[in-house]
């Protein structure tokens, strides 16, 4: 029997279960791997929108990462919502200690409606420091545009002009 892969998920918690830690954990488990987590924020949301976001302090995030990995070393890391520059820098600090090569970043920065979910300073830090350490980035179209990876100029399918 093949040994089970261990994935550390660093992301926000979605009370509806449709995104964030909950969705990532379900995906990892469905793929036959073991999910460990470090929660960066707690959100109150449902399918229609986000009501509130309660950030977790950077030091608490570091502790979650550190203690999760003391006895179970992850084979890969999946990163989602990092809501501030301080949190991004804190996660980078933790990643350096772990020395994991397979880091997947879903840069949760821009809502489906186009609103920024993190400030410009955090976006700058993500672009200049975190992306360099990742193996794979999975932005949506608005996030890819913010990162400078894509300039989307085609009209949307709903644009009937």
Language model: regions and residue ranges:
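Acidic active-site catalytic centers that drive phospho-/nucleotidyl reactions
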Residues: 14, 24, 106, 140-143, ...
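Small-residue (G/A/S/T)-rich helix-start motifs and N-terminal tracts that mark the onset
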Residues: 1-76, 132, 148, 154
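A short linear-motif detector with a strong N-terminal bias
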Residues: 15, 115-117, 161
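Single conserved hydrophobic/aromatic residue that forms the stacking wall/gate
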Residues: 152-161
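Conserved beta-alpha-beta core of the PfkB/ribokinase-like small-molecule kinase fold
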Residues: 79, 83-151
């Amino acid at each position: 029997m093949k040994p089970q892969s261990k994935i550390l998920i660093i992301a926000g918690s979605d009370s509806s279960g449709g995104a964030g830690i909950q969705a990532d954990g379900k995906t990892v488990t469905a793929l036959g791997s073991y999910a460990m987590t470090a929660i960066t924020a707690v959100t109150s949301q449902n399918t229609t929108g986000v009501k509130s976001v309660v950030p977790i302090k950077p030091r608490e995030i570091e502790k979650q990462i550190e203690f999760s990995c003391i006895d179970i070393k992850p084979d890969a890391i999946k990163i989602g919502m990092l809501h501030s520059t301080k949190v991004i820098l804190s996660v980078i600090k933790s990643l350096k200690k772990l020395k994991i090569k397979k880091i997947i970043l879903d840069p949760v920065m821009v809502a489906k409606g186009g609103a920024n979910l993190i400030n410009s300073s955090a976006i700058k830090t993500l672009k200049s420091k975190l992306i360099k350490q990742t193996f794979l980035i999975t932005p949506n179209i608005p996030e890819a545009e913010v990162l400078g990876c894509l300039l989307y100029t085609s009209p949307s399918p709903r644009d009937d002009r």
